[in-house]
Amino acid sequence: MQLNVNDAQAIEVSELTFGGEFNETLVHQAVVAYMAGGRQGSKQQKTRSDVRGGGKRPWRQKGTGRARAGTIRSPIWRGGGTTFAARPQDHTQKLNKKMYRAALRSILAELVRTDRLVVVQDFAVEAPKTKDLLSKLTGMGLTDVLIVSDAVDQNLYLAARNLPHVDVRDVQGSDPVSLIAYDKVLITVSAVKKFEELLG
């Protein structure tokens, strides 16, 4: 299939990578797995056994007329532990490499189908100036955009750093969440070829 390039003639690309059907279920699974993998999972609270003290029972079992109490660190008591205390846990979800690649292919194909993928021969700024990048993007009618190149250009990265709706990634650093989070994805021809190599 052919992919239109903004500032040059159309290029021939793999139907498998850029022309497949959109698998919403698979993309959802990939997004959830990616976001779950980013969770820290280190939250921890103290149960009755973790709280310091409370080893000796406050009063004897029988004969006082009061309710039975075995420890002053009971969750019912002030200064006691938490009833269902949070524990550190691993939130990662397993997703096969084949499924992950298929999800990325599905996203790229959908970007092409919905005219959200803007392909350019090359994209760079001469100096790390946000103003220069902003004027360049405005000239192309792009405001909310992910810029993907085969390798991150330092000037481009620094220029985009202060723009809230602009992100710069290389092909390896692109993930399901970043690819669907922006209105448009601006991608260079070399990045298209690299995606074909990785996902083909």
UniProtKB/Swiss-Prot annotation:
Q: Which domain of life is it from?
A: Bacteria
Q: Which GO terms describe its biological process?
A: translation
Q: Which InterPro entries match?
A: Ribosomal_uL4, Ribosomal_uL4-like, Ribosomal_uL4_dom_sf
Asked whether the UniProt record includes Cytoplasm among its keywords, one would answer: no
| Any GO MF annotation of the entry | structural constituent of ribosome
> Gene Ontology terms, cellular component aspect?
ribonucleoprotein complex; ribosome
Q: Name one Pfam family in it.
A: Ribosomal_L4
Q: Which residues lie within the region annotated Disordered?
A: 38-68
Sorted alphabetically, which keywords does the UniProt record give? Ribonucleoprotein, Ribosomal protein, RNA-binding, rRNA-binding
Basic residues composition bias: which ranges? 54-65
According to the record's subunit comment, the protein's assembly and interactions are: Part of the 50S ribosomal subunit.
This molecule's function is given as: One of the primary rRNA binding proteins, this protein initially binds near the 5'-end of the 23S rRNA. It is important during the early stages of 50S assembly. It makes multiple contacts with different domains of the 23S rRNA in the assembled 50S subunit and ribosome.
Family indicated by similarity: Belongs to the universal ribosomal protein uL4 family.
The protein here is known as Large ribosomal subunit protein uL4
Q: Which organism is it from?
A: Pseudomonas savastanoi pv. phaseolicola (strain 1448A / Race 6)
Lineage, broadest ranks? Bacteria, Pseudomonadati, Pseudomonadota, Gammaproteobacteria, Pseudomonadales
What is the primary gene name for this protein?
A: rplD
